[in-house]
Amino acid sequence: FTGILFLFTVIPSRFAAPASDTAEPPVATETATLPAETATSTTAEPAGRADLCENYQMLDITSGKVEELSVRDYVIGAVCAEMPATFEPEALKAQAVAAHTYAERQHLLEQSHPTAELCGADFSNDSSQYQACFTENQARQYYGDNFEASYAKITAAVDEVLPYVLEYDGTPIIAAFCSMSAGTTESAETVWGSKVEYLVPVESEADTSAPRYLETASFTGEEFQAAVQDALPDAVWDTDMAKWVQVGACSQSGTVLEVTVGGKACS
């Protein structure tokens, strides 16, 4: 086979969080999406609130203990885990507001609809369920020799916007986010199957000029077949490699909803 080039768009799916203070910290990512509540429903709404929290309760899944941490420490830890410190200060501030909003909404949800497994906490440090949040020790491990400068930069950004959260009709929003779009954001209905009034497509043309907006990977025919063999053992490979991957349905925002690989529909 001759060489063949495929372009893939990666859609992030979940938040990632460190499991404990002693665990190896995860790699901070540039993308993350829906909070845990939306894994089961996008219609649940927390009760209203009078004031923002001063402290959150976090369940350590390793020790089983519920630990209290200040909102400031939580938001700093969340930004450390969710966004590289090399990003511009305004981006770090935006991430801080999103992280704070997520935590505030989750706190209110637990007040009105407690999750038994959380033992009274607002969330846990389970990386598969809740927003990422480094402890200071984990941030030190992750940033290494760059810790002091990185931590100071993130802390300064957090302090500037700590009083703020994003609300819709007086309730903290579902603060879903990703690193970038393909020039237009996607609707919640397309992603989750349920409408969210404020999560609708909007133009985001600046994304198309962002670093790492487009990445390519090259494979030979044999390499591509081997890569998808386990997932699609019954795939049929046409002699014309241009027919191996066919894009089917797309959303109005341009998100690929269905693709055919080796004659097999994937969605």
Segments from the language model and where they lie:
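Conserved, single-site charged/polar hotspot
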Residues: 1-267
